[in-house]
């Protein structure tokens, strides 16, 4: 069965996936290859709704492949109800990576390489509310929750591989 990594933006899903011996499929990388530009540029030019439509199709394709890989999702994959339904069908194989809000906020604030449109849009207080809303979805879909605040990516990868 395909495992799915879930978690808020900046939690380290892509970083952890680089330490897994299992075959990983990074949805953001797949989407960027498909659209021919960065996700940030696509958001700016076409908006979030257009992006979520593409994200939904990529998630469907990857889940239906059912090839025992690890799907590394983007932080907003839980926004669409259809995506949440797809993820519920993957029951017992959804893994949530969790970090404290302050850890995530500092990571995103200092990440000059990957400017995330939804992070740049909010004040810290509004971003916290956004974070709390998303966490409700993640927690409702997750079968294994891994706190990453005080773990290395290698340690997190070992937990995932043992699951």
Swiss-Prot record:
It comes from the Bacteria. One of its GO terms (cellular component) is cytosol. Binds 1 Mg(2+) ion per subunit. The keyword Repressor does not apply. Pathway: Metabolic intermediate biosynthesis; chorismate biosynthesis; chorismate from D-erythrose 4-phosphate and phosphoenolpyruvate: step 5/7. Transmembrane segments: none annotated. One of its GO terms (biological process) is aromatic amino acid family biosynthetic process. It catalyses: shikimate + ATP = 3-phosphoshikimate + ADP + H(+). This is Shikimate kinase. It comes from Streptococcus pyogenes serotype M5 (strain Manfredo). The lineage of its organism: Bacteria, Bacillati, Bacillota, Bacilli, Lactobacillales.
